[in-house]
Amino acid sequence: MAKTKAGGSTKNGRDSAGRRLGQKIGDGQFALTGSIIYRQRGTRIYPGKNVGIGNDDSLFALVDGIVKFQKIRKRKYATVVMAK
């Protein structure tokens, strides 16, 4: 005999919240030093000039300037062109 009735579906119904990944500053927009440009899992986009990479693979600006995304040999790069 079953101790409880068949109620398996009520024990499912959970999901984790979205991780808010993706682009935070668009191409051509101004970024301040330390501001996050792109949040990612793994290196979907690689750091270019004046861009650092964090422990969680987030890309951030090392200088104040304009964000540029470019594709070089099948790899996407994020760079920051310094403001004058």
From Swiss-Prot:
GO cellular component annotations of the record: cytosolic large ribosomal subunit
A GO molecular-function descriptor: structural constituent of ribosome
GO biological process: translation
Pfam families: Ribosomal_L27 (PF01016)
Keyword Ribosomal protein: yes
Family: Belongs to the bacterial ribosomal protein bL27 family.
PANTHER family on file: LARGE RIBOSOMAL SUBUNIT PROTEIN BL27M (PTHR15893:SF0), RIBOSOMAL PROTEIN L27 (PTHR15893)
Name of the protein in its database record: Large ribosomal subunit protein bL27
Naturally occurring in which organism (per UniProt): Mesomycoplasma hyopneumoniae (strain 232)
